């Protein structure tokens, strides 16, 4: 039996790579083919573009939300972590869904490597570079799909 508030492993999730200017969004399910990048949401001085997030939420109707937890390579906190945790709490309050945090170390590097491979194969163009944030979110979702027990339920 899953922990109360946990995301069911066969549920659809939205994943988020939280940055100071943009938030990458991806969708994934264990029953599908992993995860895919779906949106890049702008962050303004007043906070994220909640109207855009509401549209993504309405389109995908997730069972849970996975937010990248930025740690340093030596497990130390970094300033971005406070922002990611605050965003995760806002998501939980707004959508009343379970929210988990998953280690996102090197997810942007992995996303950049994927992007470079896809560009070399002719599947991506340079102007698609903004989509890198959403690709990092897809990496985060894939990590959760591969090891949901490694996630931390947002307290």
UniProtKB/Swiss-Prot annotation:
Coiled coil: none annotated. This is Putative pre-16S rRNA nuclease. It is found in: Cytoplasm. HAMAP family: Nuclease_YqgF (MF_00651). One of its GO terms (molecular function) is nuclease activity. The keyword Cytoplasm applies. The lineage of its organism: Bacteria, Pseudomonadati, Pseudomonadota, Gammaproteobacteria, Lysobacterales. Its EC number is 3.1.-.-. Belongs to the YqgF nuclease family. It is an enzyme of class 3 (hydrolase). It comes from Xanthomonas oryzae pv. oryzae (strain KACC10331 / KXO85). SMART domains: YqgFc. Could be a nuclease involved in processing of the 5'-end of pre-16S rRNA. GO terms for biological process: rRNA 5'-end processing. It holds the Pfam family RuvX. PANTHER family: POLYNUCLEOTIDYL TRANSFERASE, RIBONUCLEASE H-LIKE SUPERFAMILY PROTEIN.
